[in-house]
Amino acid sequence: MPIKKLRDKKKQIPKKYKEHKPKAKKKEAEGKDHGQGEKGKRAYNVLRGMHDILPREEKYWKPMFNNAMNLADHFQYGRIETPIMEEVGLFVRSLGKGTDVVEKEMYVFENDEIGRVCLRPEATASVARAFINGGMWNYPQPVKLWYWGPMFRHDRPQAGRYRQFFQVGYEILGAEDPAVDAELVLIAYNFYKDLGFPVEIRINSIGLPEERERYKAELANYYRAKKSYICEDCRKRLLKNPLRLLDCKADQCQPIKDEAPQIVDWLSDASKSYFMKVLEYLDELGVPYNLQPTLVRGLDYYTHTVFEVYPAVPSENPGEEKAQSALGGGGRYDLLVEEMGGRSTPAAGVALGIDRSVAVLKHYAEKNPLNLPKPVYDIFFAQLGDRAKGRALKMINDLRKSGMKIGFNLYKNSLKTQLELANDLKVPYALIIGQKEVQEGTIIIRDMESGIQEIVDQKKAENIVKKKLKKFDDGDK
Ligand code: AMP
Protein backbone atom coordinates (compact mmCIF):
# COMPACT_ATOMS: atom_id res chain seq x y z
CA MET A 1 0.00 0.00 0.00
CA PRO A 2 1.47 3.46 -0.90
CA ILE A 3 2.73 5.34 2.13
CA LYS A 4 0.26 8.20 1.61
CA LYS A 5 -2.66 5.78 1.63
CA LEU A 6 -1.29 4.12 4.73
CA ARG A 7 -1.02 7.51 6.42
CA ASP A 8 -4.61 8.36 5.46
CA LYS A 9 -5.73 5.03 6.84
CA LYS A 10 -3.94 5.71 10.09
CA LYS A 11 -5.85 8.98 10.38
CA GLN A 12 -9.10 7.07 10.13
CA ILE A 13 -8.43 4.95 13.21
CA PRO A 14 -11.07 6.08 15.72
CA LYS A 15 -9.67 7.52 18.89
CA LYS A 16 -11.10 4.83 21.09
CA TYR A 17 -8.97 2.14 19.37
CA LYS A 18 -5.74 4.06 19.83
CA GLU A 19 -3.16 2.76 22.23
CA HIS A 20 -4.26 3.01 25.82
CA LYS A 21 -1.85 4.66 28.22
CA PRO A 22 -2.90 4.80 31.83
CA LYS A 23 -2.99 8.54 32.66
CA ALA A 24 -1.96 8.65 36.29
CA LYS A 25 0.95 6.29 35.86
CA LYS A 26 1.98 7.48 32.41
CA LYS A 27 5.12 9.33 33.50
CA GLU A 28 6.33 6.57 35.72
CA ALA A 29 5.57 3.90 33.15
CA GLU A 30 7.27 5.77 30.33
CA GLY A 31 10.51 6.09 32.26
CA LYS A 32 10.74 2.39 33.04
CA ASP A 33 13.47 0.36 31.47
CA HIS A 34 13.21 -3.34 32.16
CA GLY A 35 16.56 -4.05 30.63
CA GLN A 36 14.81 -4.62 27.32
CA GLY A 37 14.18 -2.02 24.65
CA GLU A 38 15.15 1.64 24.60
CA LYS A 39 15.03 3.92 27.59
CA GLY A 40 11.98 6.18 27.61
CA LYS A 41 9.69 3.53 26.11
CA ARG A 42 6.87 2.23 28.22
CA ALA A 43 7.31 -1.43 29.14
CA TYR A 44 4.13 -3.45 28.80
CA ASN A 45 3.02 -5.90 31.39
CA VAL A 46 0.78 -8.88 31.05
CA LEU A 47 -2.78 -7.95 32.00
CA ARG A 48 -3.89 -8.42 35.60
CA GLY A 49 -5.20 -11.90 36.21
CA MET A 50 -3.58 -13.26 33.05
CA HIS A 51 -0.23 -14.98 32.74
CA ASP A 52 2.29 -16.08 30.17
CA ILE A 53 3.11 -19.73 29.93
CA LEU A 54 6.86 -19.72 29.34
CA PRO A 55 8.93 -22.49 27.75
CA ARG A 56 10.27 -23.49 31.16
CA GLU A 57 6.69 -24.41 32.12
CA GLU A 58 6.45 -26.73 29.16
CA LYS A 59 7.55 -29.74 31.17
CA TYR A 60 4.36 -29.41 33.23
CA TRP A 61 1.97 -28.38 30.47
CA LYS A 62 3.05 -31.00 27.98
CA PRO A 63 2.20 -34.02 30.16
CA MET A 64 -1.18 -32.38 30.85
CA PHE A 65 -1.97 -32.13 27.16
CA ASN A 66 -0.54 -35.54 26.27
CA ASN A 67 -2.45 -37.11 29.10
CA ALA A 68 -5.66 -35.38 28.06
CA MET A 69 -5.20 -36.54 24.48
CA ASN A 70 -4.32 -40.12 25.42
CA LEU A 71 -7.41 -40.39 27.60
CA ALA A 72 -9.53 -38.97 24.79
CA ASP A 73 -8.08 -41.50 22.34
CA HIS A 74 -8.49 -44.42 24.68
CA PHE A 75 -12.07 -43.58 25.63
CA GLN A 76 -12.86 -42.50 22.06
CA TYR A 77 -13.68 -38.81 22.27
CA GLY A 78 -13.44 -36.69 19.12
CA ARG A 79 -11.70 -33.32 19.44
CA ILE A 80 -13.87 -30.23 19.11
CA GLU A 81 -12.69 -26.62 18.91
CA THR A 82 -15.27 -23.90 19.33
CA PRO A 83 -14.59 -20.17 18.96
CA ILE A 84 -13.60 -18.30 22.10
CA MET A 85 -16.22 -15.66 21.28
CA GLU A 86 -19.94 -16.41 21.49
CA GLU A 87 -23.24 -14.60 21.80
CA VAL A 88 -23.85 -13.43 25.35
CA GLY A 89 -27.28 -15.06 25.33
CA LEU A 90 -25.76 -18.52 24.96
CA PHE A 91 -24.33 -18.35 28.47
CA VAL A 92 -27.17 -16.38 30.03
CA ARG A 93 -29.63 -19.04 28.96
CA SER A 94 -27.47 -22.06 29.79
CA LEU A 95 -25.62 -21.12 32.97
CA GLY A 96 -28.51 -19.08 34.35
CA LYS A 97 -29.07 -15.41 35.13
CA GLY A 98 -28.42 -15.58 38.86
CA THR A 99 -24.96 -17.14 38.56
CA ASP A 100 -21.75 -15.25 39.38
CA VAL A 101 -20.24 -16.18 36.05
CA VAL A 102 -23.04 -14.55 34.08
CA GLU A 103 -23.70 -11.66 36.43
CA LYS A 104 -20.18 -10.50 37.13
CA GLU A 105 -17.52 -12.42 35.32
CA MET A 106 -18.12 -12.30 31.58
CA TYR A 107 -16.06 -10.14 29.23
CA VAL A 108 -18.81 -8.61 27.13
CA PHE A 109 -18.36 -6.54 23.97
CA GLU A 110 -20.99 -4.55 22.13
CA ASN A 111 -20.69 -4.25 18.41
CA ASP A 112 -23.20 -3.03 15.81
CA GLU A 113 -22.33 -5.77 13.40
CA ILE A 114 -22.18 -8.79 15.69
CA GLY A 115 -24.36 -7.65 18.59
CA ARG A 116 -23.54 -8.50 22.21
CA VAL A 117 -20.76 -11.04 22.33
CA CYS A 118 -18.47 -12.30 25.06
CA LEU A 119 -15.33 -14.32 25.62
CA ARG A 120 -16.43 -17.79 26.66
CA PRO A 121 -16.34 -18.36 30.42
CA GLU A 122 -16.64 -22.13 29.89
CA ALA A 123 -17.15 -24.45 26.95
CA THR A 124 -20.06 -26.80 27.71
CA ALA A 125 -22.65 -24.34 26.39
CA SER A 126 -20.55 -23.87 23.24
CA VAL A 127 -20.29 -27.63 22.78
CA ALA A 128 -24.08 -27.96 23.13
CA ARG A 129 -24.49 -25.18 20.55
CA ALA A 130 -22.03 -26.87 18.19
CA PHE A 131 -23.84 -30.20 18.69
CA ILE A 132 -27.00 -28.55 17.41
CA ASN A 133 -25.40 -26.42 14.67
CA GLY A 134 -23.33 -29.34 13.42
CA GLY A 135 -26.35 -31.67 13.24
CA MET A 136 -24.59 -34.09 15.57
CA TRP A 137 -27.89 -35.59 16.70
CA ASN A 138 -27.73 -37.42 13.36
CA TYR A 139 -24.46 -39.12 14.34
CA PRO A 140 -24.51 -42.52 16.01
CA GLN A 141 -25.30 -41.73 19.65
CA PRO A 142 -23.81 -40.96 22.04
CA VAL A 143 -21.43 -38.37 20.65
CA LYS A 144 -18.26 -38.09 22.71
CA LEU A 145 -16.30 -34.84 22.41
CA TRP A 146 -13.28 -33.33 24.09
CA TYR A 147 -11.78 -29.83 24.01
CA TRP A 148 -8.73 -27.99 25.29
CA GLY A 149 -8.50 -24.22 25.35
CA PRO A 150 -8.60 -20.91 27.17
CA MET A 151 -11.63 -19.65 29.12
CA PHE A 152 -12.16 -16.11 30.38
CA ARG A 153 -13.72 -14.91 33.62
CA HIS A 154 -13.45 -11.36 34.87
CA ASP A 155 -13.10 -12.34 38.49
CA ARG A 156 -10.96 -10.84 41.27
CA PRO A 157 -7.57 -12.44 40.62
CA GLN A 158 -5.98 -14.41 43.44
CA ALA A 159 -3.92 -17.56 43.91
CA GLY A 160 -5.25 -20.17 41.49
CA ARG A 161 -7.87 -17.83 40.07
CA TYR A 162 -7.07 -16.22 36.75
CA ARG A 163 -8.95 -14.19 34.20
CA GLN A 164 -7.70 -16.39 31.41
CA PHE A 165 -7.19 -20.04 32.22
CA PHE A 166 -7.11 -23.32 30.35
CA GLN A 167 -9.57 -26.13 30.65
CA VAL A 168 -9.71 -29.59 29.19
CA GLY A 169 -13.21 -30.98 28.96
CA TYR A 170 -14.94 -34.22 28.01
CA GLU A 171 -18.63 -34.31 27.06
CA ILE A 172 -20.92 -37.21 26.21
CA LEU A 173 -24.13 -36.19 24.43
CA GLY A 174 -27.01 -38.50 23.60
CA ALA A 175 -26.99 -41.07 26.41
CA GLU A 176 -28.78 -41.21 29.72
CA ASP A 177 -26.96 -43.96 31.51
CA PRO A 178 -25.26 -43.95 34.93
CA ALA A 179 -22.25 -45.57 33.22
CA VAL A 180 -21.74 -42.29 31.33
CA ASP A 181 -21.56 -40.32 34.60
CA ALA A 182 -19.18 -42.92 36.03
CA GLU A 183 -16.97 -42.82 32.91
CA LEU A 184 -16.57 -39.04 33.24
CA VAL A 185 -15.62 -39.29 36.92
CA LEU A 186 -13.20 -42.06 35.97
CA ILE A 187 -11.57 -39.86 33.32
CA ALA A 188 -11.11 -37.02 35.80
CA TYR A 189 -9.67 -39.44 38.34
CA ASN A 190 -7.34 -41.07 35.78
CA PHE A 191 -6.18 -37.72 34.49
CA TYR A 192 -4.57 -36.95 37.85
CA LYS A 193 -3.60 -40.51 38.71
CA ASP A 194 -1.60 -40.72 35.48
CA LEU A 195 0.13 -37.45 36.35
CA GLY A 196 1.19 -39.03 39.59
CA PHE A 197 -0.82 -37.22 42.21
CA PRO A 198 -3.90 -38.36 44.06
CA VAL A 199 -7.17 -36.47 44.03
CA GLU A 200 -10.36 -36.54 46.01
CA ILE A 201 -13.68 -36.87 44.18
CA ARG A 202 -16.67 -35.21 45.84
CA ILE A 203 -20.01 -36.21 44.46
CA ASN A 204 -23.71 -35.52 44.92
CA SER A 205 -27.02 -35.67 43.05
CA ILE A 206 -29.22 -32.62 42.56
CA GLY A 207 -32.00 -34.57 40.83
CA LEU A 208 -34.43 -33.00 38.40
CA PRO A 209 -35.47 -29.32 38.31
CA GLU A 210 -38.87 -29.96 39.93
CA GLU A 211 -37.22 -31.87 42.79
CA ARG A 212 -34.68 -29.09 43.13
CA GLU A 213 -37.40 -26.42 43.21
CA ARG A 214 -39.13 -28.18 46.11
CA TYR A 215 -35.80 -28.49 47.90
CA LYS A 216 -34.94 -24.82 47.23
CA ALA A 217 -38.22 -23.76 48.84
CA GLU A 218 -37.49 -25.91 51.88
CA LEU A 219 -33.93 -24.59 52.13
CA ALA A 220 -35.13 -21.00 51.86
CA ASN A 221 -37.71 -21.63 54.61
CA TYR A 222 -35.02 -23.07 56.84
CA TYR A 223 -32.64 -20.12 56.24
CA ARG A 224 -35.40 -17.51 56.57
CA ALA A 225 -35.96 -18.65 60.13
CA LYS A 226 -32.22 -18.10 60.80
CA LYS A 227 -31.89 -14.85 58.86
CA SER A 228 -30.50 -12.82 61.73
CA TYR A 229 -27.60 -15.28 62.22
CA ILE A 230 -26.34 -15.56 58.65
CA CYS A 231 -23.77 -13.40 56.86
CA GLU A 232 -24.58 -10.47 54.60
CA ASP A 233 -23.81 -12.47 51.42
CA CYS A 234 -26.10 -15.29 52.50
CA ARG A 235 -28.95 -12.84 53.02
CA LYS A 236 -28.55 -11.83 49.39
CA ARG A 237 -28.29 -15.46 48.29
CA LEU A 238 -31.48 -16.22 50.16
CA LEU A 239 -33.32 -13.75 47.95
CA LYS A 240 -31.58 -14.48 44.68
CA ASN A 241 -30.40 -18.07 44.54
CA PRO A 242 -30.96 -20.09 47.75
CA LEU A 243 -28.94 -23.07 46.46
CA ARG A 244 -25.83 -20.91 46.65
CA LEU A 245 -26.30 -20.67 50.42
CA LEU A 246 -24.58 -24.04 50.43
CA ASP A 247 -21.40 -22.52 48.92
CA CYS A 248 -20.92 -20.15 51.88
CA LYS A 249 -17.54 -20.41 53.59
CA ALA A 250 -18.14 -17.83 56.37
CA ASP A 251 -17.53 -19.29 59.84
CA GLN A 252 -20.75 -17.87 61.26
CA CYS A 253 -22.81 -19.76 58.66
CA GLN A 254 -21.15 -23.17 59.05
CA PRO A 255 -23.27 -24.54 61.94
CA ILE A 256 -26.42 -23.42 60.11
CA LYS A 257 -25.23 -25.04 56.89
CA ASP A 258 -24.39 -28.27 58.73
CA GLU A 259 -27.96 -28.55 60.00
CA ALA A 260 -29.59 -27.51 56.70
CA PRO A 261 -31.95 -29.90 54.90
CA GLN A 262 -30.13 -32.10 52.37
CA ILE A 263 -31.14 -32.30 48.75
CA VAL A 264 -30.89 -36.10 48.67
CA ASP A 265 -34.03 -36.25 50.85
CA TRP A 266 -35.99 -34.40 48.17
CA LEU A 267 -35.04 -36.69 45.32
CA SER A 268 -37.59 -39.05 43.75
CA ASP A 269 -36.96 -42.78 43.96
CA ALA A 270 -35.98 -42.80 40.29
CA SER A 271 -33.38 -40.05 40.82
CA LYS A 272 -32.05 -41.78 43.93
CA SER A 273 -31.68 -45.09 42.19
CA TYR A 274 -29.95 -43.41 39.21
CA PHE A 275 -27.42 -41.92 41.63
CA MET A 276 -26.94 -45.23 43.46
CA LYS A 277 -26.12 -46.88 40.15
CA VAL A 278 -23.45 -44.24 39.43
CA LEU A 279 -21.89 -44.92 42.83
CA GLU A 280 -22.02 -48.67 42.28
CA TYR A 281 -20.11 -48.26 39.03
CA LEU A 282 -17.50 -46.12 40.78
CA ASP A 283 -17.11 -48.81 43.44
CA GLU A 284 -16.66 -51.37 40.71
CA LEU A 285 -14.05 -49.15 39.01
CA GLY A 286 -12.20 -48.64 42.27
CA VAL A 287 -12.58 -44.86 42.09
CA PRO A 288 -12.73 -43.52 45.65
CA TYR A 289 -15.27 -40.75 46.28
CA ASN A 290 -16.80 -38.76 49.11
CA LEU A 291 -20.50 -38.01 49.20
CA GLN A 292 -20.92 -34.27 49.61
CA PRO A 293 -24.55 -33.35 50.34
CA THR A 294 -23.89 -29.61 49.98
CA LEU A 295 -22.31 -29.86 46.54
CA VAL A 296 -24.67 -28.24 44.02
CA ARG A 297 -22.34 -26.63 41.42
CA GLY A 298 -23.92 -23.19 41.00
CA LEU A 299 -24.94 -23.50 37.31
CA ASP A 300 -28.55 -23.88 36.20
CA TYR A 301 -27.94 -26.52 33.57
CA TYR A 302 -27.06 -29.40 35.87
CA THR A 303 -29.38 -32.33 36.62
CA HIS A 304 -28.73 -35.51 38.64
CA THR A 305 -25.03 -36.22 39.20
CA VAL A 306 -22.65 -33.38 40.07
CA PHE A 307 -19.04 -33.83 41.13
CA GLU A 308 -15.83 -31.96 41.81
CA VAL A 309 -12.18 -32.93 41.98
CA TYR A 310 -9.86 -31.64 44.69
CA PRO A 311 -6.16 -32.24 45.21
CA ALA A 312 -5.60 -34.79 47.93
CA VAL A 313 -2.16 -33.23 48.55
CA PRO A 314 -1.87 -29.85 50.30
CA SER A 315 -2.42 -27.22 47.63
CA GLU A 316 0.18 -24.58 46.67
CA ASN A 317 -1.33 -22.20 49.11
CA PRO A 318 -2.64 -24.00 52.18
CA GLY A 319 -4.54 -20.87 53.25
CA GLU A 320 -6.50 -20.97 50.04
CA GLU A 321 -10.22 -21.53 50.45
CA LYS A 322 -11.34 -24.97 49.47
CA ALA A 323 -13.80 -23.73 46.86
CA GLN A 324 -10.92 -22.01 45.05
CA SER A 325 -8.79 -25.07 44.93
CA ALA A 326 -11.13 -27.37 43.02
CA LEU A 327 -9.22 -28.76 40.09
CA GLY A 328 -12.28 -29.62 38.09
CA GLY A 329 -15.95 -30.29 38.12
CA GLY A 330 -18.75 -31.70 36.09
CA GLY A 331 -22.06 -33.42 36.02
CA ARG A 332 -25.12 -34.32 34.02
CA TYR A 333 -27.00 -31.71 31.99
CA ASP A 334 -29.95 -33.50 30.43
CA LEU A 335 -31.95 -30.36 29.63
CA LEU A 336 -29.25 -28.13 28.18
CA VAL A 337 -29.38 -29.08 24.50
CA GLU A 338 -33.16 -28.68 24.42
CA GLU A 339 -32.86 -25.38 26.28
CA MET A 340 -30.44 -24.26 23.55
CA GLY A 341 -33.06 -24.98 20.89
CA GLY A 342 -32.05 -28.53 19.99
CA ARG A 343 -33.79 -31.87 20.40
CA SER A 344 -34.07 -33.35 23.84
CA THR A 345 -30.59 -34.85 24.37
CA PRO A 346 -29.41 -36.24 27.69
CA ALA A 347 -25.76 -35.35 28.28
CA ALA A 348 -22.98 -35.11 30.84
CA GLY A 349 -19.48 -33.67 31.01
CA VAL A 350 -16.46 -32.68 33.04
CA ALA A 351 -14.03 -29.75 32.84
CA LEU A 352 -10.60 -29.77 34.46
CA GLY A 353 -8.67 -26.55 35.11
CA ILE A 354 -5.15 -26.88 33.73
CA ASP A 355 -3.51 -23.85 35.38
CA ARG A 356 -4.48 -25.11 38.82
CA SER A 357 -3.51 -28.65 37.92
CA VAL A 358 -0.07 -27.41 36.82
CA ALA A 359 0.32 -25.58 40.16
CA VAL A 360 -0.43 -28.77 42.07
CA LEU A 361 1.81 -30.84 39.82
CA LYS A 362 4.69 -28.41 40.49
CA HIS A 363 4.04 -28.49 44.20
CA TYR A 364 3.96 -32.26 44.15
CA ALA A 365 7.05 -32.50 41.94
CA GLU A 366 9.09 -30.58 44.55
CA LYS A 367 8.64 -33.46 46.98
CA ASN A 368 8.43 -36.40 44.61
CA PRO A 369 10.58 -35.71 41.58
CA LEU A 370 8.50 -36.49 38.56
CA ASN A 371 9.87 -38.88 36.06
CA LEU A 372 9.15 -36.51 33.23
CA PRO A 373 10.89 -37.77 30.11
CA LYS A 374 13.80 -35.60 28.96
CA PRO A 375 14.21 -35.16 25.22
CA VAL A 376 16.89 -37.46 23.88
CA TYR A 377 18.84 -36.03 20.94
CA ASP A 378 20.30 -38.31 18.28
CA ILE A 379 22.66 -35.94 16.52
CA PHE A 380 23.90 -32.37 16.62
CA PHE A 381 24.36 -30.18 13.57
CA ALA A 382 27.32 -27.78 13.67
CA GLN A 383 28.38 -25.32 10.96
CA LEU A 384 31.16 -22.96 10.11
CA GLY A 385 30.61 -20.04 7.74
CA ASP A 386 27.62 -18.33 6.11
CA ARG A 387 27.10 -20.75 3.26
CA ALA A 388 27.46 -23.70 5.59
CA LYS A 389 24.82 -22.18 7.84
CA GLY A 390 22.30 -22.08 4.99
CA ARG A 391 23.15 -25.65 3.94
CA ALA A 392 22.92 -26.89 7.52
CA LEU A 393 19.46 -25.35 7.89
CA LYS A 394 18.40 -26.97 4.64
CA MET A 395 19.69 -30.37 5.73
CA ILE A 396 17.99 -30.06 9.13
CA ASN A 397 14.75 -29.30 7.32
CA ASP A 398 15.26 -32.21 4.90
CA LEU A 399 15.72 -34.53 7.87
CA ARG A 400 12.32 -33.61 9.40
CA LYS A 401 10.80 -36.93 8.40
CA SER A 402 13.86 -38.98 9.36
CA GLY A 403 12.57 -39.54 12.89
CA MET A 404 15.88 -38.27 14.30
CA LYS A 405 15.88 -35.67 17.05
CA ILE A 406 18.39 -33.06 15.96
CA GLY A 407 20.09 -30.51 18.20
CA PHE A 408 21.57 -27.35 16.70
CA ASN A 409 22.35 -23.73 17.35
CA LEU A 410 23.15 -22.15 14.01
CA TYR A 411 23.48 -18.73 15.56
CA LYS A 412 26.73 -19.55 17.34
CA ASN A 413 29.62 -19.11 14.97
CA SER A 414 32.35 -20.83 16.95
CA LEU A 415 32.72 -24.54 16.24
CA LYS A 416 34.09 -25.09 19.74
CA THR A 417 30.94 -23.62 21.33
CA GLN A 418 28.73 -25.71 19.10
CA LEU A 419 30.58 -28.91 19.99
CA GLU A 420 30.24 -28.04 23.67
CA LEU A 421 26.49 -27.78 23.14
CA ALA A 422 26.58 -31.17 21.42
CA ASN A 423 28.36 -32.56 24.48
CA ASP A 424 25.72 -31.07 26.81
CA LEU A 425 22.99 -32.79 24.81
CA LYS A 426 24.93 -36.06 25.07
CA VAL A 427 24.54 -36.87 21.39
CA PRO A 428 26.68 -39.74 20.09
CA TYR A 429 27.38 -37.97 16.76
CA ALA A 430 27.82 -34.42 15.50
CA LEU A 431 27.46 -33.54 11.84
CA ILE A 432 29.80 -30.72 10.89
CA ILE A 433 29.65 -28.70 7.73
CA GLY A 434 32.03 -25.91 6.63
CA GLN A 435 32.63 -23.96 3.43
CA LYS A 436 34.79 -26.75 1.98
CA GLU A 437 32.12 -29.39 2.62
CA VAL A 438 29.47 -27.18 1.00
CA GLN A 439 31.57 -26.93 -2.12
CA GLU A 440 32.34 -30.64 -2.23
CA GLY A 441 28.86 -31.84 -1.28
CA THR A 442 30.23 -33.65 1.77
CA ILE A 443 29.75 -33.53 5.52
CA ILE A 444 31.83 -34.60 8.51
CA ILE A 445 30.44 -37.14 10.96
CA ARG A 446 32.17 -36.86 14.32
CA ASP A 447 31.96 -39.62 16.90
CA MET A 448 31.56 -37.52 20.04
CA GLU A 449 33.09 -40.10 22.34
CA SER A 450 36.25 -41.01 20.41
CA GLY A 451 36.58 -37.75 18.48
CA ILE A 452 37.12 -39.77 15.28
CA GLN A 453 35.80 -38.00 12.20
CA GLU A 454 34.89 -39.28 8.76
CA ILE A 455 33.86 -37.39 5.65
CA VAL A 456 30.80 -38.67 3.79
CA ASP A 457 28.64 -37.63 0.87
CA GLN A 458 25.86 -35.27 2.04
CA LYS A 459 23.27 -37.34 0.22
CA LYS A 460 24.34 -40.50 1.99
CA ALA A 461 24.69 -38.89 5.42
CA GLU A 462 21.14 -39.72 6.60
CA ASN A 463 21.48 -43.45 5.93
CA ILE A 464 24.98 -43.67 7.36
CA VAL A 465 23.98 -41.87 10.56
CA LYS A 466 20.84 -43.96 10.92
CA LYS A 467 22.90 -47.15 10.64
CA LYS A 468 25.32 -45.86 13.27
CA LEU A 469 22.45 -44.94 15.60
CA LYS A 470 20.88 -48.35 15.17
CA LYS A 471 23.48 -49.97 17.40
CA PHE A 472 22.13 -47.82 20.27
CA ASP A 473 18.58 -49.09 19.60
CA ASP A 474 19.97 -52.62 19.83
CA GLY A 475 21.13 -51.84 23.35
CA ASP A 476 24.86 -51.48 22.55
CA LYS A 477 25.22 -48.12 24.27
P1 AMP B 1 -15.98 -24.69 37.05
O1 AMP B 1 -16.79 -25.34 35.98
O2 AMP B 1 -16.22 -23.24 37.22
O3 AMP B 1 -16.05 -25.45 38.34
O4 AMP B 1 -14.49 -24.81 36.54
C1 AMP B 1 -13.85 -26.06 36.39
C2 AMP B 1 -12.40 -25.90 36.75
O5 AMP B 1 -11.81 -24.87 35.96
C3 AMP B 1 -12.16 -25.46 38.18
O6 AMP B 1 -12.21 -26.53 39.06
C4 AMP B 1 -10.79 -24.84 38.08
O7 AMP B 1 -9.77 -25.80 38.08
C5 AMP B 1 -10.83 -24.20 36.73
N1 AMP B 1 -11.17 -22.78 36.89
C6 AMP B 1 -12.39 -22.21 36.97
N2 AMP B 1 -12.29 -20.88 37.12
C7 AMP B 1 -10.97 -20.60 37.14
C8 AMP B 1 -10.21 -19.40 37.27
N3 AMP B 1 -10.79 -18.21 37.39
N4 AMP B 1 -8.85 -19.50 37.26
C9 AMP B 1 -8.24 -20.69 37.12
N5 AMP B 1 -8.89 -21.85 37.00
C10 AMP B 1 -10.24 -21.81 37.01
Name each model-derived stretch.
Residues 2-477:
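TRNA-recognition modules of translation machinery and tRNA-sensing kinases, especially anticodon-binding
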